[in-house]
């Protein structure tokens, strides 16, 4: 079985690349993302719309209400192993995402050391200014009012009605920044979807900068695998960490 691993920081184009390869190969994509396992925060977690998937298959490691909490890394890794093992008779599978903890679980596990051929592609952060331009565009899209999905701010306003969800939201990029923004400006969370244009731009910039901080931590803490078709990228002999 060929495993095509695509990993990199947020806003680096991983999902678009995975969809393109899925279109070319017909293989499903398994999302290496713990936050995307909560459909109630589909927009803020970056889950692609059905229309964006272009008839390709995307597999999430769980589907749970946010009040149950974010799936922990070890549980996500067990579910990933199950998905891959169950599909071992297939020609290939695409693994795509940027969960630091899940990728490091993979790096430590003997499961990935044999029985697979690998193609590994790592996307890089690159220039910070270019990243912020992409991140601002992405956040603006998350703020857009759409018929097929609530905006990030609408998701936040709805979920804020559930006290059990609040500490979880305060620990997720984007939502955390919006909550702090509301407190700074003495706004109720329910007011955020209707803020004026000036504050809208200010919040977009703030979230983009939070994404940059997260991307820098991803670049620092990701495991590093040999790229371009290495046979066993997670073997301890070849695995290193970026420091």
Curated annotation (Swiss-Prot):
Q: In which domain of life is the source organism classified?
A: Bacteria
Enzymatic reactions: dimethylallyl diphosphate + AMP = N(6)-(dimethylallyl)adenosine 5'-phosphate + diphosphate
The EC number(s) attached to this protein equal 2.5.1.27
What InterPro entries does this protein map onto? P-loop_NTPase (IPR027417), Tzs (IPR002648)
Q: Keyword set for this entry?
A: Crown gall tumor, Cytokinin biosynthesis, Plasmid, Transferase
Keyword Transferase among record annotations: yes
MF-aspect GO terms: AMP dimethylallyltransferase activity
| Any Gene Ontology biological process | cytokinin biosynthetic process
Q: Does the keyword Transferase apply?
A: yes
What this protein is reported to do is described as: Transfers dimethylallyl groups to AMP as part of the biosynthesis of cytokinin phytohormones.
Please identify the protein, giving its name as recorded. Adenylate dimethylallyltransferase
What organism is recorded for this protein?
Agrobacterium fabrum (strain C58 / ATCC 33970) (Agrobacterium tumefaciens (strain C58))
